[in-house]
């Protein structure tokens, strides 16, 4: 019998789990109330890289690869979102806490702190959406506890994801995306052995590229594979065209992927390859996404593309989710950029960098209503800073997705003193 090496770890060294633990059929289970601080993380060395294109695994669900939020959360919770006409959720990427798990833990704590006790469901995040690189460096099954289940043990809502290059960069002897498929694309919400003492069950996404349907927005998730700059081929590109063409226009259409189309960082930069795929498909079917969310670059950037017809498209990079190494931004004449800054990609296409953060980890909170997409990006303390500092609001925007334009951030107009009124002992006084 295998000797136990830690809590929930009753297997031999190097032995990978292959079967799911018993679980009530068809019931999703998420995080729980936090009783105490999470444990420590091991230190790892970085393996050699093999960044060639990986063939996609077979889908675990049926076309068109849709997952409706109503099948994951309770009917009463779903109805609450419909009634409120408001959807709140978290977005983040590149979250795996290999080498130094404290950064990931601080982000996880920050997202937990963003939940408001006793607030209506629509005012609290309904889920977390991860933009890839859930587990470093090779998406191994054995890393899912320390880099996924344990850090988010007390995140009380569902977690969805698209794979990143590190999720698919499999080691010899392992199938590409094996860990991702087990833990995000299960055929039913089973408790996986790698979850160990976590409550969370595996998510039931139908494919590595898929669409999340919600009452307030649809999220088209792409898998941009392993190569630098990403690579999307048929049949995924054909599926993307069908989704853009067929999904409802009554709610915003948000595309998610790992490799960003635009980025002003000095490490990865953007991907003209992803740009060509997305734009060629969108032009062919006559519909462009209302917003694009990506990770891969380990910082935060809000970039805007100004279209010739006067509309705007936000391209947002949210990749400072917990991986220890943050990415610096490009400099102008040796100096740090001061947004807004307009720069061009390799094809000369100009975009504007509106806001960025490259020295802190953080997360994004988004709210969607019938007209607006409201974004708030929060940074969390670094390890050397007081944890009591808490979440710090770094960016705020309101985007009218129907008009496809930002609403300017303005302070309320001051009320002239001549019309101010005073209340004394509960009675309304005369005008001053």
Regions found by a protein language model. Name each.
Residues 94, 132-133, 164-165, 222, ...:
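Active-site glycine-centered loops adjacent to acidic/histidine catalytic or metal-binding residues
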Residues 97, 135-136, 261, 299:
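Short active-site segment of divalent metal-dependent hydrolases/proteases
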Residues 263-265:
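A short acidic, helix-capping loop that chelates divalent metal ions and anchors anionic groups
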Residues 89-91, 129-130, 219-221, 254-256, ...:
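Structural motif
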Residues 257-259, 296, 317-319, 377-379:
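Active-site proximal loops enriched in glycine and acidic residues that flank catalytic Cys/His/Asp
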Residues 29-77, 142-252, 267-291, 299-357, ...:
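Extended active-site neighborhood of metal-dependent phosphoesterases/phosphodiesterases
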Residues 1-127, 145, 149-161, 175-179, ...:
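Acidic, histidine-bearing metal-coordination/catalytic regions of metal-dependent phosphoesterases
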Residues 98-102, 136-141, 229-232:
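Acidic-and-aromatic substrate-binding clefts and catalytic sites of carbohydrate-active enzymes
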């Amino acid at each position: 019998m295998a000797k136990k090496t830690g809590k929930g770890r009753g297997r031999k060294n190097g032995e990978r789990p292959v079967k799911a633990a018993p679980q009530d059929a068809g019931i999703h289970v998420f995080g729980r109330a936090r009783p105490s601080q999470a444990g420590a993380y091991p230190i790892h060395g970085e393996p050699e890289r093999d960044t060639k294109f990986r063939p996609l695994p077979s889908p675990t669900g049926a076309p068109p690869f849709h997952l409706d939020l109503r099948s994951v959360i309770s009917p009463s919770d779903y109805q609450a979102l419909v009634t409120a006409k408001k959807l709140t959720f978290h977005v983040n990427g590149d979250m795996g806490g290999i080498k130094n798990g404290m950064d990931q833990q601080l982000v996880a704590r920050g997202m937990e702190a963003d939940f408001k006790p006793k607030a209506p469901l629509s005012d609290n995040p309904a889920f977390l959406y991860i933009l890839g690189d859930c587990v470093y460096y090779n998406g191994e099954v054995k890393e899912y506890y320390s880099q996924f289940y344990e850090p988010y043990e007390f995140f009380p809502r569902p977690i969805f994801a698209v794979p990143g290059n590190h999720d698919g960069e499999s080691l010899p002897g392992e199938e590409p995306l094996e860990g991702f498929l087990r833990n995000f694309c299960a055929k039913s919400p089973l408790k996986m052995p790698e979850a160990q003492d976590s409550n969370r069950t595996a998510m039931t996404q139908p494919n590595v590229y898929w669409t999340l349907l919600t009452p307030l927005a649809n999220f088209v998730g792409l898998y941009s594979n392993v190569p630098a700059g990403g690579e999307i081929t048929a049949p995924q590109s054909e599926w993307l065209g069908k989704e853009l063409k067929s999904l409802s226009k009554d709610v915003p259409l948000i595309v998610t992927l790992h490799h960003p189309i635009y980025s002003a960082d000095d490490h990865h930069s953007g991907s003209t390859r992803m740009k060509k795929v997305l734009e060629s498909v969108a032009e062919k079917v006559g519909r462009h996404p209302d917003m694009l969310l990506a990770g891969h670059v380990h910082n935060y950037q809000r970039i805007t593309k100004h279209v010739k017809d006067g509309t705007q498209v936000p391209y947002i990079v949210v990749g400072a989710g917990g991986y220890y190494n943050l990415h610096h931004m490009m400099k102008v004449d040796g100096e740090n950029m001061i947004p807004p800054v307009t720069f061009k990609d390799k094809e000369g296409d100009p975009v504007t960098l509106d806001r960025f953060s490259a020295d802190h980890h953080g997360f994004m909170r988004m709210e969607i209503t019938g007209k607006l997409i409201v974004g708030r990006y929060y940074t969390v303390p670094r390890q050397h800073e007081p944890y009591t500092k808490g979440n710090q609001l770094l960016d705020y925007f309101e985007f009218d997705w129907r008009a496809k334009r930002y609403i300017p951030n303005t302070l309320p107009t001051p009320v002239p003193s001549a019309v101010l009124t005073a209340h004394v002992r509960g009675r309304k006084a005369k005008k001053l």
